[in-house]
Design a protein with these regions (language model features):
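Active-site activation/catalytic loop segments of kinase-like enzymes and analogous catalytic loops
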Residues: 206-230, 245-262
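ATP/Mg2+ or Mg2+-diphosphate-binding catalytic cores
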Residues: 128-144, 151, 250-285
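A conserved alpha-helical element in kinase catalytic cores
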Residues: 39-78, 90-105
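A cross-family kinase active-site recognition segment
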Residues: 91-150, 173
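Juxta-kinase regulatory segment immediately upstream of eukaryotic protein kinase catalytic domains
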Residues: 1-15
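Residues forming the ATP-binding cleft of Hanks-type serine/threonine protein kinase domains
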Residues: 86
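Active-site acidic catalytic loop and adjacent metal/ATP-binding pocket
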Residues: 20-33, 37-38, 68, 160-210
Length: 285
């Protein structure tokens, strides 16, 4: 879908080019003399308003953000909005330790903000690890996808075992970005200046932030974070189970919809890191 001409005319925008997006789609436009970004939202109204509320909440915390300019406005059942253009260059992938330090600094900036409500439609990674529905779904698909189900079940049981003894009741949730990856950051002159993509922003356990920031391979992100804000043994014990839970959540949703894994999830589950401790044992093929 391309931007509706009537909307472009109403908001007096000139198209520059397509910017892409995973679920939400974006176009760079000219708003008067300034660059801006037009967004087509993937989600429903509640999700749109939630994410805009997050942007409003963190608006005064010192980074350039895709701040709302106009909208949101529904056109033929799809939501659109206009946002500030976030200037700067993406952070190099190989600069993981600095990215980890920036993540810790971001959490420090957000520490005293009011905690937002739960994200609409977000069940959370804990559900994958704690609810019997995950086991029932694996049982139901074992005959059709034996290799995948065996892989998923092995990692699910290992993650659950690793969480025994963790005192979840004493762990306080915080606002996390949820996708602190190089392509969602903007830097100028070696300094983090901008942050984008709040599709996964939500109140959650601190260690859920590392699911996509670490991904089982970027160990220096964790080390860089700890350089600024020390992580406890309990924090580190959650690192791998929560990463696996993120992967398994997507895998289980695909199983439920009848979507066959193309190998991506299986490859990610097999990745091992020194930070995994005892969970670094290889999967027994």
């Amino acid at each position: 879908m391309t931007p509706p001409p009537a909307l472009l005319n109403a908001w007096k925008l000139q198209m520059i080019g397509e910017l892409g997006g995973r679920l939400n789609c974006h176009w760079q436009v000219r708003d008067g003399r300034e660059r801006a970004v037009l967004r087509r939202w993937y989600g429903l109204e509640a999700e749109v308003k939630y994410e805009l509320g997050i942007l409003n909440l963190i608006g005064g915390t010192g980074l350039h953000l895709p701040t709302l300019r106009r909208g949101p406005q529904a056109v033929d059942g799809t939501w659109w909005s206009l946002h500030d253009f976030v200037a700067g260059a993406p952070v190099p992938r190989e600069d993981a330790r600095r990215r980890g330090r920036w993540l810790a600094e971001l959490h420090a900036r957000w520490h005293d903000l009011p905690l937002p409500p739960a994200r609409p439609g977000w069940s959370g990674v804990w559900a994958v690890l704690s609810e019997p529905a995950a086991d029932a779904l694996l049982d139901a698909h074992e005959t059709a996808s034996p290799a995948d189900v065996r892989l998923y079940r092995w990692h699910l049981h290992r993650a659950r075992t690793a969480l025994i003894g963790i005192h979840f009741a004493t762990r306080s949730p915080m606002l996390i970005h949820g996708d602190f990856t190089p392509w969602n950051l903007r830097m100028q002159r070696g300094v983090l200046t901008g942050l984008m993509d709040f599709e996964f922003a939500r109140p959650a356990d601190l260690m859920e932030e590392f699911a996509l920031a670490w991904r089982g391979i970027h160990d220096d992100v964790v080390r860089g974070y700890a350089d600024h804000t020390p992580l406890t043994d309990e924090d580190l014990a959650l690192l791998t189970p929560l990463w696996w839970a993120h992967l398994l959540g997507g895998a289980l949703r695909d199983l439920e919809r009848g979507i066959q894994d193309d190998g991506w999830t299986a490859r990610r589950l097999r990745v091992r890191s020194p930070l995994m401790g005892e969970l670094a044992a290889p999967y027994p093929d």
